[in-house]
Curated annotation (Swiss-Prot):
Self-association and partners: Toroid-shaped homodecamer, composed of two pentamers of five dimers.
The gene coding this protein: folE
Organism: Parabacteroides distasonis (strain ATCC 8503 / DSM 20701 / CIP 104284 / JCM 5825 / NCTC 11152)
Protein name: GTP cyclohydrolase 1
GO CC annotations, alphabetized: cytoplasm
Reactions performed catalytically: GTP + H2O = 7,8-dihydroneopterin 3'-triphosphate + formate + H(+)
Length: 196
């Protein structure tokens, strides 16, 4: 278990004070038993849910980057579960990311792709930007022949409030290089279909 540094603890304490104030402004009795530790719990949870601000996704990819000049086909990591927070309402959105790249000179450890997804998801986000950030990070770091990212997500800000559409699913995609060719994109989309 990693140690929590002083700066993190100070920030957590300040956040907890603000959350206590929010609870009071909502009309709650902040001294009732069930809420006594809630501000600290929420502060700790928010630090975890936004820890991606303090992590370097390019360093994660570089930590397991290997030269491989022979393999020139798609590498796909699909059905990567993620949770994020919408920057507009700070409500969760969650779903699956599907990521592919076509190596030119380098490959990366397979576990590094989900880690990159998590780093960008653990920030206040919008799905469209998260899709682009994952694509751009892989393209910049591995310099492959192409990258494609598809994200499918449910947004609690659409399900719990607003239009209240509980079964809606939002899909975003972005791509570079060889994935600009319709045939390559079609191959990727066929490979990530959920026909198990």
């Amino acid at each position: 278990m990693s140690e929590v540094n002083e700066e993190t603890l100070r920030a957590r304490e300040a956040l907890a004070g603000h959350y206590k104030e929010v609870l009071g402004l909502l009309g709650e009795d902040v001294e009732r038993e069930g809420l006594l530790k809630t501000p600290e719990r929420v502060a700790k949870a928010m630090q975890f849910l936004t820890k991606g601000y303090h992590e370097d996704p390019e360093a994660v990819l570089r930590s397991a980057m290997f030269q491989e000049e022979d393999y020139k086909q798609m590498v796909i990591v699909k059905d990567i579960d993620f949770f994020s927070l919408c920057e507009h309402h700070m409500l969760p959105f969650f779903g699956k990311a599907h990521v592919a790249y076509i190596p030119k000179k380098y490959i990366t450890g397979l576990s590094k792709i989900p880690r990159v997804v998590d780093i960008f998801a653990r920030r206040l986000q919008i799905q469209e930007r998260m899709t682009m950030q994952i694509k751009d990070c892989i393209q910049r770091t591995l310099d492959p022949l192409g990258v494609m990212v598809v994200i499918e997500a449910q947004h609690m800000c659409m399900q719990m409030r607003g239009v209240e559409k509980q079964n809606s699913l939002t899909t975003t995609s972005d791509f570079t290089g060889f994935f600009q060719q319709a045939k390559t994109r079609e191959e990727f989309m066929n490979l990530i279909k959920h026909n198990r």
